[in-house]
Amino acid sequence: MKGTYTYEYPRPAVTADIAIFTPDMSEVLLIRRGNEPYKDCWALPGGFMDMDETLEQCAIRELKEETNIAADCLWEVGAFSKVDRDPRGRTITVAYYGFADRATSIKALDDAADIAWHKLSELPPLAFDHHEVLEKELEKVKCNKNLTVNSK
């Protein structure tokens, strides 16, 4: 839906941030930011939603643009909306997670200066509130892995 938008009330920007884990859950894929804010800091791949896409489409597009991973399945974790989470202005992010083998072809693209797998036990400092986002993503993965289907 393209066009001119006028609103009576101010609107926050909306982003998607994606954690890609190895299947054994020992590592997560991070990008090193090429732009301010947090230039040269490690972060989850992600970015701003376009007006003509859904949040899931945004997550899939941003993941491809920054890492070269073409996701076919991402799971939504939830929204993060602290007022000061982004120094550029009011931003709400929706977090997603997925899985990829370490053998998956990755490449730092778009505004990612570098890309690397990081052990969850040895994470570097992360940009924005990405430590908090990653914690919630890990909780969600563990919860989903513990779900059982009642076949009665």
Model-derived features: positions:
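Conserved Nudix-box catalytic region and its N-terminal flanking loop in Nudix hydrolases
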Residues: 26-69, 147-152
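Residues that recognize and position ribonucleotide moieties
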Residues: 12, 42, 116
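Acidic, metal-coordinating catalytic segment for phosphate/diphosphate chemistry
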Residues: 1-17
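Unchanged
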Residues: 49-73, 78-142
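A short beta-turn/loop motif at secondary-structure boundaries
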Residues: 10, 36, 84-86
